[in-house]
Amino acid sequence: MVWGLFPVDPLSGEDKYYIFSKGIYKVGRKGCDIIINKDKGVSRIHAELTFDATTVSTSRRNKSSSDTSSFVIRVKDCSKYGTFVKTDLGTKDKVHELSNKEKILQDGDVIAFGTGSAIYRLSLIPLVFYLCPSSETFKVDQPVQDAVSSIGARISPTLSEECTHVLLEPRMQVNEALINAILAKKTIILTNWVMLLAEKSICSEIPGYSQYRPSVMVEEALVDVLELNVREKCLEGFTFVLEPTDTYRFGCSFPSLLEVCGAETVTIEDISSMSQDSQFGEINRMICVIPKSAGDKFGRFKHLSLLSRVNEMDLVCAVFSGNLPSTSLIPPSVVISSSCSTDETVVADSEAEEEETTSSVHMIDATEKAETPEKPAAIVIEDSPVTILEETSNLNEFKSVNLLADTESRGHMDEKNSSDSVTIRRDRNDEAETGKSEIIYTQDLIVRDLRSTRKVQSTGGEGVVDFKRFRKGNVTCGNSFSSLIPFAKDPYKEYDSWDVTDFMKEEKKRKQMEAIAEDLFKTEKARKRGTAGSIRGFLSGS
C-alpha cells in the first residue's frame, strides 16, 4: 500500500507527500524529507515517521482483510513545541507525553506539528494491480511481483472492483480480458510503471501515466491505449447500427464496449421499425458496423443504403485510441441512373493546338445532313485538305465532308456532282469574327487528314468510341489578335493614310510659323529695350 501525508487545508500551500517504501522519514525544516514552512514553531528536525513492514493490516476501512505487505507507522516527537495526534475516535494525544515519545498511527489520523498551524492527514492509498494475461499460460514475472510487494501493493488474480490498475505487457494482442478491463473503466498502464514506483521512497506526487501508455495489437494494427477520460467520450454523438451480436468477434461485449465510449447502439430490427424523427438522432450520425466474419449485409435493407459504414475492427481501434478518424468511415454507395448517359458528344469552342501553320479552316458546318439515309452522301468544299467522315447506321458506310474556306462569293449551294456530293461556297464575311467555328460532333464522327498517311479512327476494335484520338483543327492558339480584338479584322483599315499625311504636314507648318513669330517677338523686344537705355533715345522721346 502507498501512504500519503496530505495537508488538511488545501489552500495552505504545503506539499503533498507519497511514501512508497519502508524507512525513517524526518519531518521539519529545510533539509528534511517532509518540509513544513507554514508553522514557525516547527523545529529543524521536528519529528520522525517510521514505516515498518508487518503482517497486520493497519487500515480501518477493511479490517477483515489481512495484507502481508502493509506497514506499521510510528511517529516520534523530537521538537520543542510538541506533536499532536487526533484519531477518528476524537481523542487527541500529545506525543511527547507518551512513553518513548512515540505513537502508532493508523489510516485517517490527523497530525499537528508545532503550534498547530501545520496539520496533516495520514491516508492510505490502496494499489491493487491486475495483470492482464496475454495467453492461457500467462505467468507473472518475479521482478514484477517483487516491485509490487516493495511498495506495499498486491496483485489480484481476477479483475474485481478493488482493482485500481490493469498492467499490460508491450504489444499485447487484444483479447476478452482486455475488453473486460475497458468495460470496467480501469486505468491501463505498462508494468514498467510499477518498477518506477519501486525505485522511489518518497515524492510529492505520483508519477503520471503519459509515458507508460501501452500499445496493443488489434489484428495487424498497433494502437496506443489512451487515458480513461479521453476514451469515455470519443464516440459521443454517434449511433451504431449493429447486426446480431453473435456475428461480431467480442459478442455481447461489443455493444457495451461502444456505450462505454459514449455511443448509442441500435439493432437492425429496431431501426427498421422506428420513424425518421426518432430519438436516435439525425441520419448522418448513424453508422452501420460491418462484422468481420459476416461481411457487409446492410445493402439488403433499402432504408440503410444512405448510411455510412465502418468495419468492426476499426471501431475497436477507435475505442482504445480515443479517436474515430474520418478515413475509417466508408461512404454510402451512389447509384447512377441510365439517364446520365448521352448519345451525342458536343465539343465546345476551345483553343486548339496548331498542327500545321500552312493550312487553316475558317468554318466547319457539320449540321448538314444527307438527303437520302439509304445512300451515303458527302458535302464537299473544294480543295480541302481535311475530310470528315460520319458513320451511318451501317458501320462500314461513312458520310464524307470535305472543307475549304471560299473567300470569293456568298455562301450558297450551287450544284450537285455525279457522286451525289454537294458543294457549298461561303463568303468570308459570313464566318464568325473570332475566326473560330462551332463544331457539333456526334458519337461516331471521325476526322481524317487527307494529306497525312496516318489514319485517325474514332472507334476501337470493338466499336467503342475513342474520343482521345481526334485531331484538333488548325486554329491559332493563345492570345491571338483576332481573339483580343474581335471587332476589327484590319485595325488600320478605317484610317485614311492620305488624311493622316495632310494632317501631319499642317501640324508641322503651324509649329514652324509659331517659331518664326516667337523669334520676331523676341527681336523687337530686345531692340526696344536697347533704344530706351540710350541717351539719344531718351532725348528723342522727350
Swiss-Prot record:
All copies of domain BRCT, residue ranges: 119-195
Region (Disordered), start-end ranges = 409-430
Alphabetical list of SUPFAM superfamilies matching this protein: SMAD/FHA domain
Q: Name one GO cellular component term.
A: chromosome
User: Which biological process, per GO, is one annotated for this protein?
Assistant: DNA damage response
List the induction conditions: By X-rays.
Q: Which UniProt keywords apply?
A: Cell cycle, Chromosome, DNA damage, DNA repair, Nucleus
Q: What happens when the gene is disrupted?
A: Hypersensitivity to the DNA cross-linking reagent mitomycin C.
Where the record annotates domain FHA, the positions are: 25-90
Stored Gene3D superfamilies = 2.60.200.20, BRCT domain (3.40.50.10190)
Protein's cellular compartments? Nucleus; Chromosome
Query: Is DNA damage there in the keyword field?
Result: yes
Annotated region Involved in MRE11-binding: where?
465-500
Q: Show the PANTHER family listed in the entry.
A: NIBRIN, NIBRIN-RELATED
Physiological role: Component of the MRN complex, which plays a central role in double-strand break (DSB) repair, DNA recombination, maintenance of telomere integrity and meiosis. The MRN complex is involved in the repair of DNA double-strand breaks (DSBs) via homologous recombination (HR), an error-free mechanism which primarily occurs during S and G2 phases. The complex (1) mediates the end resection of damaged DNA, which generates proper single-stranded DNA, a key initial steps in HR, and is (2) required for the recruitment of other repair factors and efficient activation of ATM and ATR upon DNA damage.
Oligomer status and interactors: Component of the MRN complex composed of two heterodimers RAD50 and MRE11 associated with a single NBS1.
Q: Which family does it belong to?
A: Belongs to the Nibrin family.
Entry comment, domain topic: The FHA and BRCT domains are likely to have a crucial role for both binding to histone H2AFX and for relocalization of MRE11/RAD50 complex to the vicinity of DNA damage.
Protein name as annotated? Nibrin homolog
| Taxonomic source organism | Arabidopsis thaliana
